[in-house]
Amino acid sequence: DTKNGLSKDLTVFENLKTWSEMKGWKTSDDDLQRALDSVDMLNHKNLYVSQCSEGLKKRAALSRLYLSLLFDVEFWLLDEPTNELDQKGIILFNKLIQRFLENKGTVLLACHELKLFDFNYELLNLDLLKR
């Protein structure tokens, strides 16, 4: 699933573990399970990505944000992070964002639905210049 950076031939858990290893992060199975739990995916950890709905795939991808809270990540660049998420997924995503901001992280995200976010933000309007 190139849209979310997930391998359809691996389980949700295996995807997260592989991604963490590729980053060079030393994470325990408990860390990975907490990451999945942060986006309400723990009960789906043994599902193959090919069996997941688009919303579950998005949640699986967003679980990586939780892992970045455990390391010295200072910046998140996110493109339409709430696409395919249901209301519960958006609430869980907001909690991750809020926690990251409280830890002095910076988030740059592209989104058409700013009303979905329940945290303080600075809006930058980047209009294209016409010649």
How would you name each of these model-derived features?
Residues 86-95:
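Conserved D-loop/post-Walker B switch-helix segment of ABC ATPase nucleotide-binding domains
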Residues 109-113:
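H-loop/switch region of ABC-family ATPase nucleotide-binding domains
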Residues 17, 29-44:
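Conserved ABC ATPase "signature" region
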Residues 10, 52, 66-69:
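ABC ATPase signature
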Residues 74-80, 85:
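Catalytic Walker B motif of ABC-type/P-loop ATPase nucleotide-binding domains
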Residues 3, 8-25, 31:
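Q-loop/switch helix immediately C-terminal to the Walker
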Residues 57-69:
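ABC ATPase nucleotide-binding domain "signature" region
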